[in-house]
Amino acid sequence: MSEALVKIENITIEYNSYGKAIKAVDDVSMDIYENEKIALVGESGSGKTTLAMAILRMLKPPGKITAGQILHKNFNLNDLDEEELRTRRLSEFSLITQASMNSLNPVLRIKDQLVDGLLDHGKFNKEENNSKIQSVLDQVQLSHSVLNMYPHELSGGMKQRVSIACAILLNPDFIVADEPSSALDVIIQRQVISTLFSIQKKYRTSILLIGHDLGLVIQFADRIAVMHNGKIVELKKTEDLLDSATHWYTKALLKSVPSFEEEQKASNRFDKLKKTREFSQDKK
């Protein structure tokens, strides 16, 4: 295993509700390695998104880190001021949200939004910027005609691909994808995940995929962390999780994954998931 790019060390996050502290994330530790695809799965309210926002220093009040630290390239993110954070976002780490419409400015054309991201990080060469923008659109398989369109003119899948293009614009080494396909239909979901896979392979970017669809993340992730009630209850390589899950919640998640071939139901669903993952990885 390569060197840890992101280190999450004993993080506890609390929300204050009517004077009472409620733990959303409870003493969580996890390493994310260079060139790794790792998934964090669990039901709604398990603490996944709260942890993801904390990793990127985007946690909003009343959420507060009350213990632990998060390191990126061995540098404590809590030590960064707002200007340093602004500089590092997009260029070193970035976010793909589950609601792409919320991350895109509705009154700006797509090209203007991409250009703004480059200008905000000191990229002023117009020719180079145009070339870079066209390149990232090619990477997410979008026509260059999208550049002259507004977000409301795009389908859900196209908007999500634009969000991915924004996230990779400055070649960050770490991306958090927070349920990037949750609002899309099944076919588009798999296209989005396939796009993430291609991006990761080309740029060797570390990606943390947040999700609740275990069947989907199995086809993407090298390792899977299972979160329940604010704790990571299991963290294993994907194949090992399928073969030897130990926590009752992980086992329940695995049993809830629907068969991919309903007309030919197998007696061992875990074997089917493994075969599906192997086929998906071979296709890529």
Which residues are covered by each model-predicted region?
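Short catalytic/signature loops enriched in Gly
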Residues: A4, K237-K284
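Conserved ABC ATPase "signature" region
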Residues: N76, E127-S145, L254
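Conserved ABC ATPase signature
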Residues: Y150-L154, M158
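A short, surface-exposed alpha-helical micro-motif characterized by mixed small hydrophobic
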Residues: V217-Q219
